[in-house]
A protein has these predicted regions:
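N-terminal first transmembrane alpha-helix
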Residues: 1-97, 220
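Cytosolic/matrix-facing juxtamembrane and C-terminal tails of multi-pass cellular membrane proteins
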Residues: 1-15, 195-196, 212-280
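Charge-rich cytosolic interhelical loops and cytosolic tails of multi-pass membrane proteins
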Residues: 69-148
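Hydrophobic core of alpha-helical transmembrane segments in multi-pass integral membrane proteins
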Residues: 21-31, 177-179, 207-211
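Hydrophobic alpha-helical transmembrane segments
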Residues: 35-52, 182-209
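Structural signature of transmembrane alpha-helix termini at the membrane-water interface
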Residues: 56, 60, 64, 68, ...
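Juxtamembrane membrane-interface segments of multi-pass membrane proteins
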Residues: 134-137, 143-160, 224-247
Length: 280
């Protein structure tokens, strides 16, 4: 069920965490401004509301993140797992990429583009590289075996989804800051008044949160994580090549196998004309 998928490692760290960060000022306000000494109906409603809010934010972040992802690929000429396979890209050495192309061509049952073919038709070559990326993604789902790749995927998903909720989070920050300032103004900025210190804490959280969203959450950060994931995805070919290993050299089947010298046997009691037994 989709509900239980929400609690897997990727969903928690790449989808739920961005939602929690985006709603941090609101969560701080609910925690500090509502009494939790006794768990009553208002607390129950607030708790359910928070869970629903986080679910909605996580879904919105994923949708917006994917939309931003498409624009980033367009700006940089394609997915990193495609652009890094190109011969014009030096992120991964050409010798390794030649081995990866040959391996993936065998898995896909398609010929890898030569240097001349790629230079003549980059779009066709990119189509092949896109198929390579799809094959690798489908065959590297073992998060224990490909733990480094899984970590890069989570980092990319986290940054992408957090960027997706950057604008709504900043709007929420502005609203909370305005409300907190108005409340403190009505208290004559008396932090010792009832709820004065709690409102001040919420205000500080909102300001710090806004600074983080403005300075740390950016398209450049998402693209950097995307490149790290794309590089690791291509390098995962090494694991498959290690499993296959180098095939042993086969003897030349066109030449007859050399016969081993027959071992000398004691004379048989049977007639000397009898034919000696053949070797197995």
């Amino acid at each position: 069920m989709e509900v239980f998928k929400f609690f897997d490692a990727y969903s928690i760290r790449a989808r739920l965490f961005p939602a929690i960060i985006a709603a941090a000022p609101a969560l701080a306000a609910l925690t500090l401004l509502i009494s939790w000494k006794t768990f009553g109906l208002s607390n129950l409603i607030s708790s359910i509301g928070v869970l629903v809010l986080l679910w909605a934010i996580a879904d919105f972040a994923r949708t917006r993140g994917r939309a931003i992802e498409g624009t980033l690929y367009a700006e940089h000429g394609g997915m990193p797992s495609i652009t890094m396979f190109r011969r014009s890209d030096s992120t991964i050495d050409s010798g390794s990429k030649d081995r990866y192309r040959a391996f993936l061509a065998g898995k896909l049952g398609a010929a890898a583009p030569t240097a001349e073919e790629e230079a003549a038709d980059q779009a066709a070559a990119d189509s092949f590289y896109g198929q390579c990326g799809n094959w690798l993604r489908q065959n590297t789902r073992d998060t224990k075996k490909f733990s480094l790749l899984f970590g890069e995927n989570i980092a990319y998903g986290f940054r992408r989804n957090l960027l997706g909720v950057k604008v709504p989070a900043l709007v929420l920050n502005v609203l909370i800051v305005v409300i907190c300032v108005l409340l403190l103004w009505r208290m004559s900025w008396n932090f010792n008044a009832s709820m004065g210190s709690e409102v001040a804490v919420v205000l500080i959280v909102a300001v710090a949160h806004a600074a983080y969203m403005l300075l740390a959450v950016s398209r450049a950060a998402v693209w950097d994580a995307s490149k790290a994931y794309g590089r690791e995805l291509i390098l995962s070919c090494e694991s498959f090549l290690a499993q296959v290993g180098t095939p042993a050299a086969k003897p030349d089947e066109t030449k007859p196998a050399a016969k081993r010298p027959a071992a000398k046997k004691p004379a048989s009691k049977r007639s000397k004309a009898a034919k000696p037994p053949e070797e197995p």
